[in-house]
Design a protein with these regions (language model features):
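A structural motif
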Residues: 68-90
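Glycine-rich catalytic cores of cysteine/serine-nucleophile enzymes that process amide/ester linkages
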Residues: 9-71, 93-102
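Loop/turn positions that initiate beta-strands
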Residues: 3-5
Length: 137
């Protein structure tokens, strides 16, 4: 695992199942790995708390899967967004394949920003991130 890897989550609750159905994805949430002095953390936009950094060990109940991306991440630039709000509206629009108004962040949109993808191009979903990264050389 290294900073910049994509971390995909598959929660167990009914809301997670609805998100997977709505976004046609195997995952309901994603974030970007940040190794902090050897400790794997994830920087992510979550419904509860908005953009924040959490130790990956504290997120094991959501069945994380780590996908190597080989991408460099601007951590100081990412940390500027800590405390930004989560956007339910953007999350709903992402499920429709539309881009939101960026009044806040939804998880895949924020991960796309951190990974250097065009986060304004479309409504990002966890599945869409995997597909976009797989298609790039």
């Amino acid at each position: 695992m290294q900073t910049g890897d994509l971390v995909m989550f598959r929660g167990r609750g009914p809301v997670a199942a609805i998100i997977r159905w709505w976004t046609r994805s195997a995952w309901d949430h994603c974030g970007v790995l940040w190794m902090v002095e050897g400790v794997p953390c994830v920087i992510e936009a979550r419904f509860s708390g908005g953009v924040a950094v959490h130790a990956l060990a504290n997120r094991q109940e959501d069945g994380p899967t780590v996908y190597p991306t080989g991408r460099l991440v601007d951590i100081p630039g990412a940390l500027v967004h800590c405390g930004d709000l989560y956007s339910v509206k953007d999350a709903i629009l992402a499920g429709l394949g539309e881009s939101g108004d960026h009044a806040g962040w939804e998880c895949a949109e924020f991960a796309a920003l951190l990974l250097g993808l065009d986060h304004d191009a479309r409504g990002w979903t966890p599945q869409g991130l995997i597909e976009a990264l797989s298609a790039q050389p």
